Amino acid sequence: MRTTYMAKPNDVDRKWYIVDATDVSLGRLASVVASILRGKNKPTFTPNVDTGDNVIVINAEKVALTGRKASNKIYYHHTGFAGGLKSRTAGNFRDENPEKLIETSVQGMLPKNSLGHQMALKLHVYAGADHKHEAQKPEVLDITNLI
């Protein structure tokens, strides 16, 4: 009788991928990146083990917001003080902090537990085309074929 393969944390082979976010829809980009961070693109995927790869997202400032999301979609956060509800539109969010916009979108698609937090640490987002991970020799991932 065959048994289901369960990956061990020591057996995981991690790769580095680089994704260009230029003119790619935010949600579609986030779903593909979250899938790679979870390791769902590998045959050794195990839900309770972090089998995912590292992902570098460049040109975050050029990510596309379709429709009227740039002006109508609102992101809220609370400071913790009375009357401290803050809001900003997706367009302002992209202009002020494009890295945080993509990180927030991807984290929303990862598990809401300690394993999801561990997966989110493997995401590296940069507003421009420059990044500091050349030594890892990242593999270019054409995201338009995966959407």
Swiss-Prot record:
Disulfide bonds: none annotated. Signal peptide: none annotated. GO terms for biological process: negative regulation of translation; translation. Keywords: Ribonucleoprotein, Ribosomal protein. It comes from the Bacteria. GO terms for cellular component: cytosolic large ribosomal subunit. GO terms for molecular function: mRNA binding; structural constituent of ribosome. CDD domains: Ribosomal_L13. It holds the Pfam family Ribosomal_L13. Belongs to the universal ribosomal protein uL13 family. NCBIfam families: rplM_bact. This protein is one of the early assembly proteins of the 50S ribosomal subunit, although it is not seen to bind rRNA by itself. It is important during the early stages of 50S assembly. Part of the 50S ribosomal subunit. This is Large ribosomal subunit protein uL13. It comes from Levilactobacillus brevis (strain ATCC 367 / BCRC 12310 / CIP 105137 / JCM 1170 / LMG 11437 / NCIMB 947 / NCTC 947).
